[in-house]
Amino acid sequence: MTSLVITDIDGTITGDDRAVHLKCIRYLRELQKRGIPVGIATGNTLCYSRSAATLLGFEGPLIAENGGIVAVDDEEISTVPEEDIELIQEAYRELRRRLGVRRTEPPGLRRTEVAIYRDVPIEEVERVLDGLGYSGRIEVVDTGFAYHLKSKRVDKGKGLLVICERLGIDPDDVVAIGDGDNDAPLLKAAGLGVAPANATENVKRIADVVLDAENGEGVATFLRKLLEEVDA
């Protein structure tokens, strides 16, 4: 029995032009009408996640900042230890000094990680972090839009487990959908992990279902079948 559907946005329920795929939205809203909450899991900020959920009509829990922040109803939970947050800020300052990297947002908008522009090779960022002794606690995740400096102790999958504990949901009853490497832990933690055809090879290896079509086109087909199963 499906108790929750949680999905990434870009490359998952969007089209090639990054506009939301209307069939995906329609099917997800129909699932909600049948009592199955729909949530968002993103590398973006909680502010963005809440706005997107409101615009799309999703009423379920939210995973933001790659699992660093979780929102269940009106409760906001930071999953990252304070010492890791301080270390990430320190690492960013060193990267800015040594490589000239820049934040993608003003300071303070992200609570648990730092997102930087992809102006230098990710290997250079990792080399500096390793040389400074940060690589044991901080990792760099390339979402395709930015490099995210984040704690190794959290990811979207661990964020999902926090949600399941709060809501009393068995993770095996969760459907998770995503395409990027930062979605891999989410799909692994869920009972059913679904990846569109454009997903990275790492995500495809982890997914229980790999769709034939890319982006929202493939996900819409899956959601239609899921809706049919719920109605059966």
Swiss-Prot record:
Catalytic activity, EC: 3.1.3.18
Name of the top EC class for this enzyme: hydrolase
Binding site for Mg(2+): 8, 10, 179, 183
Alphabetical keyword list: Carbohydrate metabolism, Hydrolase, Magnesium, Metal-binding
GO MF, one annotated term: phosphoglycolate phosphatase activity
Record GO cellular component, one term: cytosol
Reaction equation(s) it catalyzes: 2-phosphoglycolate + H2O = glycolate + phosphate
One Pfam family this sequence matches: Hydrolase_3
InterPro entries: HAD-like_sf, HAD-SF_hydro_IIB, HAD_sf, PGPase
CDD domains, A to Z: HAD_like, HAD_Pase
Cofactor(s), names only, from the UniProt record: Mg(2+)
UniProt cross-references to Gene3D superfamilies, sorted A to Z: 3.90.1070.10, HAD superfamily/HAD-like (3.40.50.1000)
Binding residues annotated for substrate, in chain numbering: 156
Superkingdom field: Archaea
Catalytic residue list: 8 (nucleophile)
NCBIfam families documented for this protein: HAD-SF-IIB, Pglycolate_arch, PRK01158.1, SPP-subfamily
Family classification: Belongs to the archaeal SPP-like hydrolase family.
Classification via PANTHER family: HAD SUPERFAMILY HYDROLASE-LIKE, TYPE 3, PHOSPHOSERINE PHOSPHATASE
Function recorded in the entry: Catalyzes the dephosphorylation of 2-phosphoglycolate.
Protein name: Phosphoglycolate phosphatase
Organism: Methanopyrus kandleri (strain AV19 / DSM 6324 / JCM 9639 / NBRC 100938)
